[in-house]
Amino acid sequence: VQEDYETFLETRTFKFPSWLYGPVQGKLLKVEIEDCPNFGDKAFVEFDSARTAIIVVDMQVDFCGKNGYVDVMGYDLSLTAGPIKPIKNILDAVRDGTDIKVIHTREGHMPNLADLPYNKLLRSKIIGKGVGIGDKPEGGEGQLLVRGEKNWDIIDDLTPADGEYVIDKSAKGAFAHSDFGVTLKKLGITHLIMTGITTDVCVHTIM
């Protein structure tokens, strides 16, 4: 700890902890941290590309696409569609010859809603003024957040590429009732780069 502390004072860099994860397997990348509290105006963190995954959280039609839940319920679609282009730019860069893994998550429920908790269904109906998960709203593509429906799938602009992972989940958090944790362990992932929606719910619950 003392050695890493002294290194940080000199370089403003959180060094990759080889003592914890072992030797670097891919490229050692260094990124700037903005607005890092208690560490000054600027700091950097190192991570191993081979142990890193981009997580694209719930970029589904229901949340950010035309005729999805957010759209047909009259909410401001630009708020959830705004991240599409930046995420696409990130994916294009990652897919261009890097060994960083890409993992998409997709929230949804069985057609019979057997995996939908009572409180989640009730809350969705309250927020939707009577239209909740499993219902087909007027103007919508299909039942809201039901697996297999067109509006449940990931938007075309961010369609997973061959070899990328898609984790289906029934909860807000990706670790609950899914293969997310097992997949990270299998791939040897130690660092996550988070993208997607929504920051205060499905993204935050992974962190």
What are these regions (language model features)?
Residues 1-160:
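Active-site acidic carboxylates
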Residues 195:
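Short beta-strand immediately N-terminal to the catalytic nucleophile in serine-hydrolase-like folds
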Residues 185, 198-199:
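Active-site neighborhoods of divalent-metal-dependent phosphate/nucleic-acid chemistry enzymes
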Residues 199-206:
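Short glycine/serine/threonine-rich phosphate/pyrophosphate-binding segments
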Residues 108-109, 173, 198:
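Conserved beta-strand edge residues that scaffold enzyme active sites
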Residues 140-192:
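Internal catalytic-core helix/loop-beta-alpha segment
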